[in-house]
Amino acid sequence: PTLSKRLQNMEADLGAALFLRSKQGVTLTPAGEAAREVIQRTARELNTLREQLQMRKDTICGTLRIEVSIDYSKYRLPQVLAAYTAQCPDVTLRVSTNHSRDCLRTLQDSSVHLAIVRGEYDWDEGKILLEREPVCLIRSRENASVPLRELRYIGRDSDPEHMSMKARWLMEHKMEPDAQLNVDGLSTCVAMVNAGLGWSIVPSICLNYFDGISEPLFFADGTPLTRSTYLLYRKRESELPQVREFIRMVCAMSRH
C-alpha cells in the first residue's frame, strides 16, 4: 500500500498516468517509460556527484578571492601564490590589487574572502600581523656624503598614517623639505633615488634590490619608524578549506 500510494502521488505530481494496472501487475505507459529514463539518468548523475564529493574530501578546491595592497602584491605576493598554487593546484584564484583603504572596503562588502593591507585599520574580525618592517631613509651612493639639506627630497603620496609618521620625523629633525619631485608609486620613488635625483623615506619592503644607502629611522624618543602589513578575513569564511590553507601558508611565510 505504501508503494502504491507513492506511485499515485508521483502520477499526481506529473499530471500523467505512468502505469497501467491489472491483476498481473503494472505496465509502464509511454509517459512512464520517459519518466523511468529521467529517473535512471538522475540516479547515475547523483552517484557520480557522490563519488566526486568523496574524492574532494581530501582535495582543496573551489575559488579563492583576494584583494591585496599594491605594494604587497609587487614585493611579496608572487612568492606566496607560487607556494600556494603548488600546494593547492585545484583552487581557482581571483586576485585584485588596490590601495589598502579600498582593499578593506572590498572586504567589508563581502566581495572577497581575504584582504592584505598595509597600515593600521580597524577591523573587528580575523586580523593577523604578517610583517612589521623598518622605515628607512634612502639615498644613492654618489650622494652618500652630501648633506640632506642640499639634496632634493623625493616625496611620495601614501595613507594618512604613513604621511603623519614621516611629517613627525621631519619636524623632530628640524627639516622642512619641499617635495620638488613628488611621485605616487613606491618603486618609482626608489628608482628616482637610485638615479641620484635626491633622497626619500620609504618602508624597507621595496629595498631588496636597492643598491644605494639605506638607514632605519627613529623618532626623537628612540621609537623606530615601522610599517605593518596585516591579513584581514571574515571568521566564518576562514572555515572554507581554500581560505584556511591560504591563511596557514601566508602566515608560515610571513616575516613577523
Where are these regions (language model features)?
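Acidic, Gly/Pro-rich loop/turn segments at junctions of secondary structure
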Residues: 87, 98-151, 204-208
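Hydrophobic hinge/microswitch elements
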Residues: 99-100, 108, 118, 174-218, ...
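Secondary-structure junction motif
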Residues: 149-175, 195, 239-243, 247
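Short coil/turn segments
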Residues: 24, 69-74, 119-121, 135, ...
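A short LG(V/I)-centered, amphipathic sequence patch enriched
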Residues: 11-28
